[in-house]
Amino acid sequence: MQCCNQLSPHEQRLQDKIEGKVDRYRATHERVFTILESFDNTRPRIDVERAKYFTESMKATEGQPLPLRWAKALMHIAENMTVYIDDHQLICGRAGYQGRYGVLYPELDGDFLGTAIEDLPNRAESPFAITPEDARVVVEEIAPFWKGKTYHEALNLALPADVHKLTYDDPQGLMSRFIVNETSSFRSSIQWVHDYEKVLKRGFRSIKEEALEKIAALDPMSPCDNVEKRPFLEAIVIVCDAIILWAKRHAKLAAELAAKETDPTRKRELETMAEICAWVPENPARTFHEAVQAQWFTQVFSRIEQKTGTIVSNGRMDQYFWPFYEKDLAEGRITEDSALELLECMWVGMAQYVDLYISPTGGAFNEGYAHWEAVTIGGQTPEGRDATNDLTYLFLKSKREFPLHYPDLAARIHSRSPERYLWEVAETIKDGSGFPKLINDEEVVPLYVSKGATFAEALDYAVSGCTEARMPNRDTYTSGGAYINFAAALEMVLYNGKMLKYGDTDLGAHTGDPCEFKTWEEFWNAYVTQHHLFLKTAFVQQHIINNLRARHFAQPMGSSLHDLCMKHCLDLHTPQIPEGINLGYFEYMGFGTVVDSLSAIKKLVFEDKKLTMGELIEALKCNFEGKEDIQQLLKSAPCYGNNDDYADSIARDIDALSVKYGRRYSPELGMHNDVRYVPFTSHVPFGRVVSATPNGRKAWSALSDGSSASHGADVNGPTAILQSNFNSKNYGMRDRAARMLNIKFTPKCVEGEEGSQKLVSFIRTFCDLKLWHVQFNVINKETLLAAQRDPEKYRNLIVRIAGYSAYFVDLSPDLQNDLIARTGHDVM
């Protein structure tokens, strides 16, 4: 790392640590640094208590309405699971062991448990530790009950044969094909945002009272009221009691610890925690400390309730915490530093929870123990005013001074964002830990209005998950969408419905021998056929998924925090909730790979005739071994990411295929099933099944990620990448959604005030072009290579992956190499 001309602040801190120097920010963050060091280098452990008590309750309630069963299971968990208060902590509440931990959701994919438990400690992607006793409990007490009852098994049996063969590689559906990949069986719901403000202003006792009033108002003679509404409302009452009980158990523990504590400062801290946990989240928060604790209890209990995507978002934290912060600051109850310490106590709590995927597919899609509790800052108020405040800047300061990979900070940008805000965003990006990612109001808000939201609702969106956005109390869609490997669709054109990875198995449409195609139009039409087949497969999956989910999942706590669920007495997993907006999606994987491949075929085979189709296919089959001249020729074709209309027009045509298909068939599903370009880390396992491609990519290597250019193809600078993203979008069509865009700068590129100003201008350009998302790595390639050689020295190196940041050494070698291969821009 010392060979680099310029280090980012994050790299410099790592270098200082290697040299034995004390972090210069430690003195002002001593508490959270101490907590972090207690767990940071440990392998996550599996905690089985949630699964054990959930299973015990579900055994005892078979035959009852599902929302009631779920609420009773949550009460059983709240009564029995171990509660912890960590040393030095000021915020309490966790869903499992002390240290880094993950929990199990056997109702989801418990059919994997019997075989997966012994493999988890040794798998390449995100391994977990488990004690022998916990492994025994899983295999002997938990897994047997769920055999034949899991959501994954139901989905596997429900898929038609033609859909199944593109989805799974075995009859039981235990292994993915990585072609048209369902994602609903390794998460109960997609990413979500609760209405935390409701908890802070009302408390769960008020929500319980609302449910009791609705029960009292039911028509005792109405079949609907008795069979549908009453069980839902009774579940709300139970779950409110459950989270209140769980919080009071923490209050009791804090009081017990305080009674034994000899250090007077820590004793008072524990007494304060006991008082706070006895009050919230049952009652409205009165102070900033109470607000932070109430929010954290809500978020952790939501994790206990179900597996929500990769996590439940924190929403617009600088907005709903602001009144408490402003009041306490004015009354002298807190200082900026003490408020920051409370928030960072929450941050280290987030870092200890680790998302656990039992299935190999889930683990491969979410490497680096991925979960991203997005904290949204900035943007606009529901009235359309700029929303930045002092808390906004405090969150940015925290990211620069305490570079933890949680929370996932997301900065909303709009055309009137203040210069100071953009400057501090730029300074935080320059720090080099990958924060914040940027989301553009100028794209998101009009798009959501076009889909039925009011301006106030759209303006109040919060970032959720990788790059997605949600509107609390208006969004109602929870089903995971398909990840579609369109590079596989291209390969099926080249091999007439087959893929080299899968031998003679017929997977796609028989579009004919491409060597017999005389024109580009013939080849394009063959690609369209395969593309549409993949989309049809995804939409059939989604239709089945939508109809299955309410039979397998309920979400009483999440429903209690949604206005429409409470109004209509419907669980959040109900397929159609009146007045709700169903924002679904499918993911396009390998966009840059496919665009550049089609560009090369069109230009070199059909227009310039520098290559025959036969010569191309021969070079692809041998993975360019001995055909390096052809590989270089293919790489010389026009490429996406360079503001080149030849390639970008193909990209726009491909995007239109997906958007138009979604527009035509989404109404049949009762939803907006929109195209997104958000791969998480799936572009790596998807690449492992795709042979060499006509853009010069070698077989089995990673595909391009999101809406980014193929690695090494973007040679005209970062602004050209923004322009290509703009060129490739069909702005006149609303059936589109998130696009993830990764850009890597060297620290030298953004050095000093001049570098900050260039970055601010770059952000303004991103905003003006109405792109959805962009995120940055500011790092030297040499640092990444050094971390590969000596991972222990670089244990704390944080990098930006796919809508989230993670420790570089927690990634598989394939994903590490993918990050290294991304173009690092020296000039802007």
UniProtKB/Swiss-Prot annotation:
The modification Glycine radical is found at G803. GO terms for cellular component: cytosol. It catalyses: 2-hydroxyethane-1-sulfonate = acetaldehyde + sulfite + H(+). Residues 705-828 form the Glycine radical domain. It comes from the Bacteria. It holds the Pfam family PFL-like. One of its GO terms (biological process) is alkanesulfonate catabolic process. Its EC number is 4.4.1.38. One of its GO terms (molecular function) is transferase activity. It is an enzyme of class 4 (lyase). 2-hydroxyethane-1-sulfonate binds at R187, Q191, C466, T467, E468, R676. Requires the activating protein IseH to generate the key active site glycyl radical on Gly-803 that is involved in catalysis. Keywords: Lyase, Organic radical, Pyruvate, Transferase. The active site is at C466, E468. Pathway: Organosulfur degradation; alkanesulfonate degradation. Residues 30-698 form the PFL domain. Involved in an anaerobic respiration pathway that converts the sulfonate isethionate (2-hydroxyethanesulfonate) to ammonia, acetate and sulfide. Catalyzes the radical-mediated C-S bond cleavage of isethionate (2-hydroxyethanesulfonate) to form sulfite and acetaldehyde. Shows no activity with taurine or ethanolamine as substrates. This is Isethionate sulfite-lyase. It comes from Nitratidesulfovibrio vulgaris (strain ATCC 29579 / DSM 644 / CCUG 34227 / NCIMB 8303 / VKM B-1760 / Hildenborough) (Desulfovibrio vulgaris).
